[in-house]
């Protein structure tokens, strides 16, 4: 991100060199000369670690984490990226771990003025993925198309606006990707086969996501709907009603 000189996955090594120089190699935790490791899990074109490598690594990590969970306990992580490809890897990891998403929640996570994203159109909003092997999901969040997703996102964007944030096109894109990935996972879980080749699994997720909505579809649906800034923030149902309308998985 730093004018193409440092890959984002290599940023910690860039910082570590200077930190070690300042603190000294005898400082606890700084004994090693480098943070790099042959088994590190990053996408890195230079090191020939592609999306399949990243997806397989995430799946291995999520499987271990899922095995340690109590039944119905959540595995929660934050995620955002400008490209759909990155969400394919996360979705594959969740599905290979035998989990589904009971929620995907937009959450401000970064300052818009951060050096590596300033002026790039990148999002400052993460999606909080809440994943379980069994549980319940609110029925109104189980969207099937761009129009339904736009209705859900309109409320979320209004909430972000009311909190003092001004959602950008990049934020809208990443929020949409998070929801579309969640629903692709929901739809694929009953027929998911972990034994399939990675390339086939990633393509199945891509098709499932595109079958729900593309980013262009969502943008168009949002433009046709009510302006984000004028949507009131209120719950249609109380907690008891929402639980009654929840869908078990």
Describe the residue ranges of each PLM region.
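S-adenosyl-L-methionine-dependent nucleic acid methyltransferase catalytic domains
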Residues: 1-249
């Amino acid at each position: 991100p730093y004018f193409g000189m440092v890959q984002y996955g290599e940023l910690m090594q860039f910082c570590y060199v200077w930190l070690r120089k300042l603190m000294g190699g005898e400082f606890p935790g700084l004994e090693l000369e480098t943070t790099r490791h042959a088994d590190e899990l990053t996408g890195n074109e230079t090191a020939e670690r592609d999306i399949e490598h990243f997806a397989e690594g995430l799946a291995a990590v999520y499987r271990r984490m899922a095995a340690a969970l109590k039944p119905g306990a959540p595995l929660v992580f934050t995620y955002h990226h400008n490209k759909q490809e990155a969400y394919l890897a996360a979705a594959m990891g969740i599905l290979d771990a035998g989990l589904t998403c009971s929620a995907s929640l937009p959450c401000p996570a970064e300052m818009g003025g951060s050096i590596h994203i300033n002026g790039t159109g990148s999002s400052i909003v993460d999606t909080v993925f809440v994943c379980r092997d069994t549980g319940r999901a609110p029925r109104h969040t189980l969207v099937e198309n761009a129009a339904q997703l736009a209705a859900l996102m309109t409320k979320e964007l209004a909430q972000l606006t009311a909190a003092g944030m001004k959602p950008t096109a990049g934020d809208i894109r990443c929020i949409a990707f998070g929801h579309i990935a969640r629903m692709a996972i929901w739809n694929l879980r009953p027929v998911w086969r972990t034994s399939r080749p990675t390339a086939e699994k990633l393509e199945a997720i891509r098709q499932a996501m595109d079958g729900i909505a593309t980013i262009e579809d969502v943008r168009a649906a949002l433009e046709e709907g009510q302006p984000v800034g004028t949507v009131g923030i209120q719950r249609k149902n109380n907690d008891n009603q929402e639980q009654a309308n929840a869908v078990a998985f």
